[in-house]
Structures are given as C-alpha cells and as structure tokens.
Amino acid sequence: MNPESDRDRGETLLELLIALALMSIAVVVIVGGLVAGVAVSDVHRKQSTAGAAVRDYAENVAKFVAGTGYTSCAAPSAYSPGAVGFTAPSGYAATAVAVRYWSGTAWTTGPCTDVGLQELTIQVASTDTRAAERVVLVLRKPCGQGSTC
C-alpha cells in the first residue's frame, strides 16, 4: 500500500469545519436579507397607508371649512380629526399639528392677525412610530352666499 494514497482518501475534520462555517455564514446572510426585506416592506406599507389617510384627513378638513367650519384665530384643536369628521385607520393616529395665520406679509403663530388665511399642518402616524406623513394645507375663509369676496 502506498502511504500517499491513504492520506488522500477523504475529507479531514478541518475541511468539514470550514465547509460548515461557510454554509452557516451563507444561511445567516440569506436569512438576514429576508428579514430586512420584510421590515422594509412593513415600513413602506405603513407609509402608504399613512399617506392615503392624511390625504383623506385633508379632504375632510376642506369639506369642513367649505361648510363654514372656518374658525378665525383657530387653535389646532379646531381642526382635530373628531371636529372635521375623520377617523384614522386602525393602528394609526391623526393629529392637527399646528396652525399659522397670514398677517398680510408672512405666516405667523401669534398674535393672531387672521385675515382669512390659515396654514394648517396635519399628520397621520402609525402607532408603532414606524411611519408618519404630514400635509400642509392653506385654508381660505369661505365667502357667504351673495357675498362679493
């Protein structure tokens, strides 16, 4: 028997450990990629839902104001979801963040010099804080019937 051929018979323990380590690393990388993909997909879905919801909220505000719901020198609570008839989707919270008033030359938070224009910032955010979308609306005081604005 040739002693050289005995050493080349099969895998050694070291070769098996290296192969196992390489395969383990590959599995960890693949699983990590899948987990990251699922997390990114979840955030994107929540952003899309929040974006659609904040636009619905903005439409409710516009309808509310058009129906003479405009409040001079309003606080954000005047345009809260409950005040304008908006219900946020399950797992989301809607808020009226800020109202600023047009002074004739600039937007200001106070003192109130409301000349019929308000800038309202509204937000819809997921309750797990992964996604939030904001919209800034400019509200104009509607003219009454027969009025020349």
Put a short name on every predicted segment:
Residues 11-55:
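Aliphatic-rich helix starts adjacent to a transmembrane/signal segment
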Residues 9-13, 92-93:
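N-terminal segment of the canonical double-stranded RNA-binding domain
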Residues 45-149:
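Low-complexity, Gly/Pro-rich coil/beta segments used as flexible assembly/activation regions
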Residues 1-11:
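N-terminal leader/signal peptides at the extreme start of proteins
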Residues 6, 39, 43, 111-113:
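Alpha-helix initiation/capping motif
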